[in-house]
Amino acid sequence: MTNGEIVLFTWSDYVGLMRCRGVPLAELDRRMEHGLGWAVAGQAQSPFPDLAPNPWGPMMEVRQVPIASTKTRIDIWDDAPPFHFYLCDSQVSGGKNWDCCTRGFLKSALEDFKSETGLDFVAALEHEFMLMDDPVPAAPSFTVETMRNVAKFTQDMTYALTQANIGLETVEPEFGEHQYEVTCAPAVGLAAAERAIIAREVIRECARRLGMRASFSPKVKADGIGNGAHVHFSFQDSSGKNVTSHPGEKHDASLLTQQFIAGVVRHMPAICALTSPSPVSYFRLGPQHWSVGYASFGVQNREAAIRICPSPSMDPAEMVRGYNLELRAPDATASPYIV
């Protein structure tokens, strides 16, 4: 019997959606080097059935070239084929990243950061989402009942995310009705964004298989609880040491960290245009929303744009190792590559 498995070549666009083309499994090896063509006007797609004004029209094409290290294959369902996909680079002739490739943006930014500071950027994203069409009535926030009501979903999701190797750390109920949160372990550079992209798609797939829909929208209801995609990050030197903290300095932050925070606070309105890019994003942001109320920073302040997160350890070495910052504005309408 011919294997009917389809492998998806996927890429993250400007509105946080994963676009794709597919190839039969038998064609995969032949397509790995040069990928598949894609009309560049596709990058002007919104979440709705229209295109934003763009200079391309029907002209030009890029290649969506799969990144071998991002292979993800989830095979946990008896009644559905494996969920098999790769993340892609958008490339022009000669194997160079297209100027509008979101993955290329992040690669360039990380290279610039390392060139200027000599450091690597380490990050981890939190994923808040609502389970839509859950047939079980909502239980009180943060309770065991809330988790056990969706035990089949969380079991499948945990199994699938473990297969996806994204460093799953926590699965928990959240404050909103049918709201949950998943966190991934920190990773260096591109890997952090790739883990986030893969995690979201796997979570969506697990919900689909059970007749539900996982919504990462910043607000499902204008007056409801919001979903964020908070980014925890730190700076690492060539030896792997976390250099974000300097005990004894203000808030135990290193000079570089203080400068970085100052830059983020100063440019927060422009940063929000990239990290919270949709109209619905601004139903989530604001004072008393436990998201971002102000262009400010603070130690364990969940309404500041930048939250300083000291380590819970009392061991001096662990305190330095665990020290990190949290950018609280981002949501899932932005590509993790751009955040």
Give residue ranges: language-model regions:
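Short, hydrophobic beta-strand segments
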Residues: 86-92, 180-187, 233
